[in-house]
Amino acid sequence: MRGVRGRLAAFAAAGGVHLGALLTRRRGVERATKPVLMPLLAEYVLVRGGPRLLALALLLGAVGDVLLQCEGEAAFLAGMGAFAAGHGCYLALFARQPKKNACRLAVPYGAVWALSVAALWPGLPSQLRLPVALYSLLLTAMAAGAAGAGPRAAAGGALFLLSDGLIAGGLAGWPQARVPQFWVMVTYLAAQLLLVEGLLARPEGNGAGRVPGPVPGEAGQSWTAARASTMP
C-alpha cells in the first residue's frame, strides 16, 4: 500500500511543482516537470494492477505534452494526434463498461461539440479548423463514454473538455485568464487523475489488458516487471 501511495504522492508532488512553476514563470522548471507527469501517473496505474491500455493512454498524453512544448504547427498537430490516440485508448476502455445511458448521453455531448466548433470556427486559423473539429469530436466522444462510467470518470471527461477548450479558445483569439497555461494544466491534471481513479474503481476497467501480479501490498516490488510488460 505504501508503494501505491508513494507513486500517487510523486505524481501530486510533480504536479504541484509544475503548477507552481507556471504561476511563478519559471520556464526551465515548467519544461523539465511537464514530461514526467503522465509517466508518473501511468506508473501508479501499473502498481495498482490497472489495465495496460490505461497506462498507454497516459503515456500517449506524455508524448503530446512534450510535442506541445515545441514550436510550430507541425509539432502542435503531432501533439494533438498523440492525445487523439490516447482518447482512442480511453474509448476502448469505456467500451467495456455497461452502456445504460449511451444514447441519452450522445445527444447532449453531441450538442456541446457542435456548439463549441461553431463558436470557435471563425477565429481558428484556417489550416487548423478541420483538425481541431475532428480532434474535438473524438475528445467529446471520450467524455461521453466517461460520463457513463461513474461520477469520477464523468468529472474527468468534463475537465478534459474544459482544458482543451481553453487551448482552443486561445487559438481562436478569445480573451484569456491570467496565466492561461496554469488553468489548462490544472484542469488537465485533475482530468487525467479522475479518469484513472474512475476506471480503476470499476471491475470492468481492470479486466482485459491488466498487468498480472501486482496488488497493493506487493506494488513496490513489481514496477520494473510491470513496465517491461507494457512495452510494444
Task: Please provide the spans of the model-predicted regions.
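Polytopic alpha-helical membrane-helix bundles and their juxtamembrane interface segments
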Residues: 1-232
